[in-house]
Amino acid sequence: MIFSNFYELISMKIEDAYGRLLTESQMTDDLKEMAQELPTIEKQNGRYQCFRCGSMIDQKLWKLSEEVLYCRACIQLGRIRSDQKLYAIAQQDFEGQEVLNWKGTLTSYQQEVSDGLIKAVKEGKNALVHAVTGAGKTEMMYQVVATAIKSGQAVCIATPRIDVCIELYGRMKEDFSCSISLLHGESDPYFRTPLVIATTHQLLKFYQAFDLLIIDEVDAFPFVDNPMLYKAAQNAIKKKGTPFI
């Protein structure tokens, strides 16, 4: 389920719901007053599609009754059914802060890439960084992440693999002074922070949450050629947000 245990459900603060995609069972009356209602399952060209994960619904097998469909593809996140709604509470800006502790130096080439990423964010353009292992991709994104957080924006760095996610979290904790959430299948409950480190599957739990979404190792399993995770990334970024890969 999206909330991995009972403690997370009862302890969630309202601000922790900002930018999250929530099911009917996760809502309280207070949250519903603030939330935007979204469809669970939409009809597209005569077929039914899950709003959360984008999967096409098997109308013969994925049904609770003759009138009610559900999505089996993302049921591990909490069952959604066609006679209910999904809910999203708009993400709010953070208080801007200086967060970069890293004192290292980029090479001229790395600095050129770093400057290009900052420019892309300012211009609202997508960017692709392709480099071999050990080329310093992580350090090259430090300045654009710090710039976004200084502006009060929400940033997520997502990667397909849990081990990479955990390693990246450890490095960012040393080099950034802000609070950071780590999200994967076995992580602690989510709390709202300006910087989130997550596996790409965790993006299914967000809706228009991030101003800057960086997907690391985009060519790795299980992200590559996975329409569900492409849909998750599409949903997780704000309409005017910037995706990097």
Regions found by a protein language model. Give the residues of each.
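N-terminal pre-P-loop "Q-motif" helix
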Residues: 102-125
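Inter-Walker segment of RecA-like/P-loop motor cores
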Residues: 171-207
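A broadly conserved sequence feature marking short terminus-proximal activation segments
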Residues: 1-57
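Loop/turn-to-beta-strand initiation segments
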Residues: 153-154, 179, 192-195, 209-212, ...
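Conserved RecA-like ASCE P-loop NTPase motor core of nucleic-acid helicases/translocases
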Residues: 153-161, 183
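SF2 helicase catalytic motif II
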Residues: 204-244
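Walker A/P-loop
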Residues: 122-146
